[in-house]
């Protein structure tokens, strides 16, 4: 019996591949959210924002958190590229937009950011989430798509 697959590995099923793609999208969302919040925290810990290495080196913890945020961005990019390999862009991209909502909701609810909850912004977040859902909905069977 011939086995074309490496020992112990089964061929990837479409469902398994799709799940993997969604997990990569989720990883990208969570990492970019962590990057935004980490960099925000790091920047607000500095006495002033300057591209002055001496100021940054005098505050090593905020600098490390900012650099960790940049690292999270890099990892997020890797997750995003992996997600694009197995997830249609018209599904992955709207899901990625949920990171905007997640960053806002966390910044409002985590006291050290002290972001105000504003009705207009909250409505905007709701529209982002609603848009992501609407773009991701598949048409009902038998429904003709235009375009």
Curated annotation (Swiss-Prot):
Transmembrane segments: 24-44, 63-83, 94-114, 122-142
SUPFAM superfamilies recorded: Multidrug resistance efflux transporter EmrE
InterPro entries: Flippase_ArnF, Small_drug/metabolite_transptr
Pathway this chain belongs to: Bacterial outer membrane biogenesis; lipopolysaccharide biosynthesis
Biological process according to GO: lipid A biosynthetic process; lipopolysaccharide biosynthetic process
Keywords: Cell inner membrane, Cell membrane, Lipid A biosynthesis, Lipid biosynthesis, Lipid metabolism, Lipopolysaccharide biosynthesis, Membrane, Transmembrane, Transmembrane helix, Transport
Role description: Translocates 4-amino-4-deoxy-L-arabinose-phosphoundecaprenol (alpha-L-Ara4N-phosphoundecaprenol) from the cytoplasmic to the periplasmic side of the inner membrane.
NCBIfam families, sorted: PRK02971.1-2
Name used for this protein in its record: Probable 4-amino-4-deoxy-L-arabinose-phosphoundecaprenol flippase subunit ArnF
